[in-house]
Amino acid sequence: MVTATHPHSLGKLSRIRHLARQYAALTKPRVTQLAVFCAIIGMFLATPGMVPWRVLIGGAAGIWLLAGAAFAINCLVEQKIDALMRRTAWRPSATGEITTPQTLVFSAILGGAGMWLLHVYANDLTMWLTFATFLGYAVVYTILLKPATPQNIVIGGLSGAMPPALGWAAVAGEVPAEAWFLVLIIFTWTPPHFWALALYRRADYAKSGLPMLPVTHGERYTLLHILLYTLIMIAATLLPFVYGMSGYIYLAAALALGAGFLAYAWKMYRNYSDELAQRAFRFSILYLSLLFAALLVDHYFKFVPQV
């Protein structure tokens, strides 16, 4: 026997799904996924064995929720700016579909739940470090730095670079030098990654009034800085090998991926096009994902030739 579903019920279910997608959009899911992925890699690198399941799941979920809370505040603060930019005008905070009070409550729920998960399933060090990262992104970067200086992404990049240290702390209860190497890699990766986006979206940023480097200093200056920061980033990626934290599997991956990144930076510097900048931006995301995956593979299958 087939039971008919009332049209009103279908409409209500559809609205709930739509609203859930809108709230999820406030957390910038793709950015959050990459951050949590790096945090999980940090967890595995902190131990020679397997990460305890409660720490892996509870810790990752807590970091995910606090990251989402920070991004929701970012969307709230920048709702008027987002409405001016084609890339972000669709966001529910920019369209007004989700109101300011609703966004604040949503962020508070995510943040509170994330803090609780980290307290219960990880440790207080991770909880407070993640909360500090939340403040660093939502307040220091979004409110203070981003509208004030073209070096916003450099100075404020530390909060976005913290996930590996958060993951490491969740397992080990400390943040040793090895964890800070991972933070440094993401910290130096962030400017060339973001400036590639800002270059091919510079008309949007000019309209928004935000002092992004391509808008304030021009294309050529930005391209030079992308090239320089790419070289600094490649040097930073060698630290895990130099320190003895990683072996030749990671070194080979770091050099190969770094060569690819440098090729994009050099091509843009020599013969810029928006299409090339867009490809470089996409590659930068793949680059970081593969680099951290190589760290994980090397951690469990380290190859160091005998002398």
From Swiss-Prot:
Per the record, its GO cellular-component terms are: plasma membrane
Q: What class of enzyme is it?
A: transferase
What does the record give as its pathway?
A: Porphyrin-containing compound metabolism; heme O biosynthesis; heme O from protoheme: step 1/1
Fetch the Pfam families from UniProt. UbiA
Q: Which residues cross the membrane?
A: 31-51, 55-75, 103-123, 125-145, 153-173, 179-199, 223-243, 246-266, 285-305
Keywords, ordered alphabetically: Cell inner membrane, Cell membrane, Heme biosynthesis, Membrane, Transferase, Transmembrane, Transmembrane helix
Q: What is its EC number?
A: 2.5.1.141
Question: Catalyzes what?
Answer: heme b + (2E,6E)-farnesyl diphosphate + H2O = Fe(II)-heme o + diphosphate
Name the GO terms of the biological process aspect: heme O biosynthetic process
PROSITE patterns on file: UBIA
Compartments reported by the entry:
Cell inner membrane
Sample GO molecular function, one term: protoheme IX farnesyltransferase activity
Write down the membrane topology. Answer: Multi-pass membrane protein
Disulfide bond residue pairs:
none
Q: Which PANTHER family match?
A: 4-HYDROXYBENZOATE SOLANESYLTRANSFERASE, PROTOHEME IX FARNESYLTRANSFERASE, MITOCHONDRIAL
Family designation: Belongs to the UbiA prenyltransferase family. Protoheme IX farnesyltransferase subfamily.
Relay the record's extra comment: Carbon 2 of the heme B porphyrin ring is defined according to the Fischer nomenclature.
Q: What does this protein do?
A: Converts heme B (protoheme IX) to heme O by substitution of the vinyl group on carbon 2 of heme B porphyrin ring with a hydroxyethyl farnesyl side group.
Protein name as it appears in the record? Protoheme IX farnesyltransferase
Please report the organism this UniProt entry assigns to the protein: Cupriavidus necator (strain ATCC 17699 / DSM 428 / KCTC 22496 / NCIMB 10442 / H16 / Stanier 337) (Ralstonia eutropha)
User: What gene name does this entry carry?
Assistant: ctaB
